[in-house]
């Protein structure tokens, strides 16, 4: 059991937030008598008013008989005292009816989401709290389009294929799609199939995660555990197999939940962050879904953003690491490619199958060697990159299918291909060029030349190199306060004398490990190697991507809300710095940095709720490895967090803040970090 006395005391004291609850519980079971308060905090409904107060209570929907029947069936299945049944039925039917009316939802027969009330009923909540909890769960944890052939289930199939291609292929041949067996899993968060006790144990952990995407990994474990049974049984009856899969959660016991979450966390850590970041619009409270034209039903495999690929190339240690396979024709690859990419010409698959087979064999051997040698190019996860133009990428899908048919796990495609990679680097490094990110077989690095309106772009050679590879792109960008005119960016091979520019301090693969990945002029450096696990302060010279950020999701859907002044006045807060949080896209959010003896918190102000903020970030001071500032903008401070190991430092997060009097702020933070490090060393 958790420290029940500490938890009870914290809850009684008031002002308790989810972070405090997590720190006390630390993954252990929630005491039954405290579950109500813990869940209300986790769902952000503590102290919320009665949403039904303005409703006249009319149960007059066209589908009301259907709602009444399903609510009655729900009550009959629960262990409820006879004298409570009538009042409870009224509460449940009112909650369902008001939800349908307020959200303009037409109730469907046997809707799986009605079973979300099963574990809530056991808490014996008043009607207002019952509705608030139900509403919060529906908005935050039940995805849009959670129905037959819905987008959430197409995404789940891609996740299953990523980790268990053999099982996915088997189910595909049977034409068994995830919506046929997992609709009630997702629609009820397992409440449809599991007992109330088991469901409450699952929700105790799940609500503390505060991440709706974690449900995907709990569902994945359901299938992983059923794999041997599904593949081993000779079931010709499709419906029988679907029923077998659908009932998998029914066998769960309370004692299984700890292992369930441990396994889910493992698969979560082995999945590209793009899985979550690129599909945030599946969840949220907005009545109008974010515009997302991605047709996941036609996707051959998971897509990974180029920003994540670049960040993975910088990291060391555990985590998702990509072995990038460039599938463009040889002349395009030779003109310029990601420095760590292996070349596999997809055209060979039809033009010269024998040579293609040899190339695949070489690819797998190179991948193995790069992992064993600890090369920066090494990674278990194969990510295939095309040009980004449909007419040029006709064969890359055939290459992907080739690997998937061999049940190769961890297969993905670079979203937008090489064009997206170039555009991403251009957007973030227009003044400084590509540095060592993109190389050519001649050893010269591609760079970006910018020309003002009306100027013509003249290549450094007679049209060869990067200019012949890609079209000119027009990009618009902003400075701090002035809109700069559109510039035409011409990508050319830089054969002239290199200009002075900031280079990227990125360790490249050892030449001996993967000869074809690097050119003879690439430098080899291993920053941080042999350095003590302490942070450094200096001018910002490195390329960063804020891949850990999750702000693209509605904050209302995943962040806990706190009172800013209450947090500032906490006795353990040593420093408070008003600031703006700055994202890679230039967006700024009024925020507050709070420094305690051991941690730094970022509270992002809620513009629509004065005096309150979301806990946007919480970082241990012991994990700060570097603090940098821009020469031209010294008030723009970048914090890098990570952990050290035998081979160096692995960067786990990057945050940027615009801080008035930044010098005083960084000095105070530095002093507190030194105290933490001194304490750790002693």
Curated annotation (Swiss-Prot):
CDD domains: TBC1D23_C-like. GO terms for cellular component: cytoplasmic vesicle; cytosol; trans-Golgi network. Residues 29-210 form the Rab-GAP TBC domain. GO terms for biological process: embryonic brain development; retrograde transport, endosome to Golgi; vesicle tethering to Golgi. PROSITE patterns: RHODANESE_3, TBC_RABGAP. It comes from the Eukaryota. Residues 318-426 form the Rhodanese domain. InterPro entries: Rab-GAP-TBC_dom, Rab-GAP_TBC_sf, Rhodanese-like_dom, Rhodanese-like_dom_sf, TBC1D23, TBC1D23_C. Pfam families: RabGAP-TBC, Rhodanese, TBC1D23_C. Keywords: Cytoplasmic vesicle, Developmental protein, Golgi apparatus. Gene3D superfamilies: Rhodanese-like domain, Ypt/Rab-GAP domain of gyp1p, domain 3. The keyword Methyltransferase does not apply. It is found in: Golgi apparatus, trans-Golgi network; Cytoplasmic vesicle. PANTHER family: TBC1 DOMAIN FAMILY MEMBER 23 (PTHR13297:SF5), TBC1 DOMAIN FAMILY MEMBER 23-RELATED (PTHR13297). Putative Rab GTPase-activating protein which plays a role in vesicular trafficking. Involved in endosome-to-Golgi trafficking. Acts as a bridging protein by binding simultaneously to golgins, located at the trans-Golgi, and to the WASH complex, located on endosome-derived vesicles. Plays a role in brain development. May act as a general inhibitor of innate immunity signaling. This is TBC1 domain family member 23. It comes from Xenopus laevis.
